[in-house]
Swiss-Prot record:
Known function: Encapsidates the genome, protecting it from nucleases. The encapsidated genomic RNA is termed the nucleocapsid (NC) and serves as template for viral transcription and replication.
Keyword Ribonucleoprotein among record annotations: yes
Subunit: Homomultimerizes to form the nucleocapsid. Binds to viral genomic RNA.
GO molecular function ontology, one term from the record: RNA binding
The keyword Thylakoid appears for this protein: no
Similarity annotation: Belongs to the ophiovirus nucleocapsid family.
Organism from which the protein derives: Citrus psorosis virus (isolate Spain/P-121)
Gene Ontology cellular component terms for the protein in this record: helical viral capsid; host cell cytoplasm; ribonucleoprotein complex; viral nucleocapsid
UniProt-recorded name of the protein: Nucleoprotein
UniProt entry keywords in alphabetical sequence: Capsid protein, Helical capsid protein, Host cytoplasm, Ribonucleoprotein, RNA-binding, Viral nucleoprotein, Virion
Cell compartments where the protein resides: Virion; Host cytoplasm
Source species, domain of life: Viruses
Amino acid sequence: MSIPIKVSQLIDAKTKWESEKEKSPAEILTLLKTYGVLRDTGALSSKSTAFLSGLSKDKRVILTDEGLAEFKSVENPHDQGEKPAFTLASSSSIKITNIEVIKQKMEQETFQIDQLKLKEQIENFIKTVTLDDESYTEGEIIIKHFGNPDAELNMLITAGTKILDGLVYVSMKGDTKSLNLFKMEQVDGVCDSDIIKNIRVAKRAIQAAFVLIFTQGSLPGKADDKRKVPEFVKSKLYDGDVSLSQISEELSHAPTKKFPARVFLKIDIDNLPSAVCSRCKLNIAGNRSVRYAGFASSFQTKQKLSPAVGATPESLMPLLETNQKIEKSIAIRDFLKTMEGQWKNQKRLHPLSDEKPTIKNFTLKLTCAIIYSLTPDGRIDMAERIITDKNKGFQNDRNFFGDGEGPTRTWSVLTKPEADFSNITVDGLKGIFGVASTM
């Protein structure tokens, strides 16, 4: 914990560093690093600079475990009948043992998620689903408390219980068969800084969990999870440097794969902070075809073929079949494009959804239809735009991006038997997306 410092001092130091960089005096570098404004890598912390810019220059701040925080000096907090203001002072290392005082301080750090709904969904999941070999083992879930194991979730979190562990615990209260899953640890007290740390870690971890489930399809794993951390999670919820294994550790003592992650899909994400909510809705897992269709629709579309003069009925059959295939591919692509922004419909295709389609190679078939709907020139132009836009997500799927370079680029998806979309219909897609019931 650092000593309080005026915002103006840090802003002036940052301005000087920005103009002189490595030539800045050593005391400037030390000051900025001490307060987390300048990272050891030599880059400014976007989180810290954004926080400073939102404060008046006469305010004072300190560095906590969670980053910069406004310092509030309270000489007589009981004036005018007000509640004691929450202060971060040198006494923050002293443990508080009075439960009512802990509650007062805890209430200033609230969760913005529907905890009751999460609890209800977990209860329903536990009643109806068997986890088999992925079930929790004895003592795997650690619950910390201040002498009252029946306390509310926020109090358990304040005591140091991890958020997913706490959710499982409060959802399984009264289930005597599950008591052996929990290792109970009584905490005698907690200091100011740990109250803030425990709750803020839980808040950022649960928000990251929502983003990862909605956009990547699952909770973060431990050391074996090689997926990339979304930029939003790194820059908005953390301070740039975080791994999936770290987020996993903040969520639960037990392996996160054992938590019934599908319950997150049952929660009204509009209760989340607006930025987190928007990010969840923007890129829902299982809906690559929707994003592909929206992107591809701006490139040259095939036209139906016209019969040659004097064509015989026999020679017209292949042409009619080709035209039907062109017509179907365009209809599929155009319908998928209408699903852009329809996050509730898209949620039905999420890998954890009970309503996800059971058609084998479903996304591959839709991708084939989208590619088939474009002319050869349209496909080439689309690939060039993907390269120009540096869209790594699209480039990583060769079925959509193709292989080769320039005019010689090819799309093997068009010849894969498993990508045949003849059994896909727009009416069928409407049923899969639940259009009739939700739009």
